[in-house]
Amino acid sequence: MMEEYVVIGKVLDTFGLEGELKVRPYAPPEVFENLEKVYLKRKGGDWVPFEVEWVDFIDDKVIIKFKGYDSIDEVEQFKGAKLFLPKEELPELGEEEYYAYELVGMEVETDKGKKLGKVERVQDMGPYDALVLDKENLLVPFVSDIVLKVDKENKKIIVKEELLPV
């Protein structure tokens, strides 16, 4: 059986002069805290492992240093790349934490019972993530003021109707 990989972040830019990378995390901090290896996908489809030398956190970004990449010139090639982990290596999350892949396919409805559609994907909007729904490409900000409940068991997300951008 083929391993399933999950995106955990995206390289935004280089950081410093010694091969560090600034990453926008798509996963909670605990995924990065003990990170030993990440995977990037080659254009041909092969998964390439990279050993992680160290990880640091600055504001809402993650700084990662790969072993053996010690200059800015060596890591320029990674700008824009997505970082992956095999699904089975992801740590268990807390009660109110979710990986983006877990939300895909969930039904979204309002607290008044109106069905809005299924989550097609989770889109990075900068300061927050948004749920892209299959009906009319509706975007629902994935923020605590709007998302009232995520029911993993019943694959349902309840959102506050009066705060929706519709």
From Swiss-Prot:
Stored Pfam families: PRC_RimM, RimM
GO MF: ribosome binding
Location of the protein in the cell: Cytoplasm
Entry superkingdom: Bacteria
Cross-referenced PANTHER family: RIBOSOME MATURATION FACTOR RIMM (PTHR33692:SF1)
Protein family (similarity comment): Belongs to the RimM family.
Protein name: Ribosome maturation factor RimM
Taxonomy of the source species: Bacteria, Pseudomonadati, Aquificota, Aquificia, Aquificales
